[in-house]
Amino acid sequence: MEYPTESPKPKITRKTVIFPIIGLAAFFLYIYIFQVDMLSIIAKAQTADPVLYALAVAFSLIEVFFFSVSWRVLAKFLMIKMSVMKSYLLVWYSVFVDTLVPAESVSGEALRVYMITREQGKETCGRAVASLVTHRILGMVMNVVVLILGMVLFFTGTQIDPLIFNLVLLLSIGITVTLLLLILFSFKEKWSLKVINWVVRAGNFLSRGRWHRKLIKIKEDAINIAKSFHDSMKEFKNNPQPLVFSLFYLAVMWGFSLSVPYLVFLSLGQQVSWSVILITATIVLAVKSIPIGIFEVGIPEITMTALYTVLLEPTLGPEAAAGISITATILTRLITLWLRFGIGFAAQQWLELKTVIAPADNVPVEKA
């Protein structure tokens, strides 16, 4: 069996175009409903300090770097060969796919699994999945920690809105439950085998036996991948050192991530509490991490603007809070969405170009 040399490049379809348009329309509808003066928003954005804003851009690039290094630590422990630069480019590629393809919280990860498997052979698939699942688990741990830290800081400074408190509490419980289920499933190999058997039986039933041979081959491959995945998770359990290093890099990443909106507010001449940044960032990220559909254009802007407005209203007043919140949100998303989308596209083109010009003997081939 020969592995394909072309990756499943994300194609521009009707859905990939219409979803961002709907999201942007929803955001501007939100602005219209609350009668926000867009001219004053634009005028305020033009006064942003270019040095501080450029620093926010640099911090965003460094944030992605530490995210990729954090994942690479886990992949390297599982004997997946990958340079620091390669992991950085793969993460940028996944950012591009995450933005373009619905269910963004898993599409980029699936892309990274495919790229590793394509280049290093099918036997690395289970290990690649294990590295990404473990990285997601560590990321969820950091989400809960930062969310709680934001609440503590906010409580020490002012009285928090009951709606925000209930939302933070609900998300903390939801993330924790999901985290525990994910950890439990990662170490229950029998559960994975039962799911595989159920899917194969369902496929046989729906196809009335026409896909029997193909399903048997798929079942064999899936079982091998599942065993490799669970063996890799056991390796992490027996040697937690890479988990510690990965978590450390994630903590550094969070520092740069939170600094981006903070610097954007500073560039607009507005000092804000770190608790406002922590709570808003973790709520947006927590909702984005749920693989239920699109959450990349429109909805994050609405969420960020609403949270900033509610959290800043006690100190700035409703009108000023709304104005600065929308301006900061737009400038932040120019960095964390559109700039990253462009860089991700460049990374995708570079990686695919390297694949095309690579010698044929570098392509892994498995004899049937």
Q: What feature does the model see in each segment?
A:
Residues 1-43, 97-211, 297-368:
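Transmembrane helix-loop-helix hairpins in multi-pass inner-membrane proteins
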Residues 10, 55-63, 135, 241-253:
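Alpha-helical segments in transporter systems
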Residues 14-18, 47-55, 234-248:
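Membrane-interface helix starts
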Residues 65-71, 103-112, 260, 275, ...:
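Transmembrane helix boundary and interhelical junction motifs in multipass membrane proteins
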Residues 68-93, 264-280, 304:
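Membrane-embedded helical hairpins/re-entrant loop segments and their flanking transmembrane helices
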Residues 121, 205-229:
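Short, membrane-interfacial amphipathic segments enriched in basic
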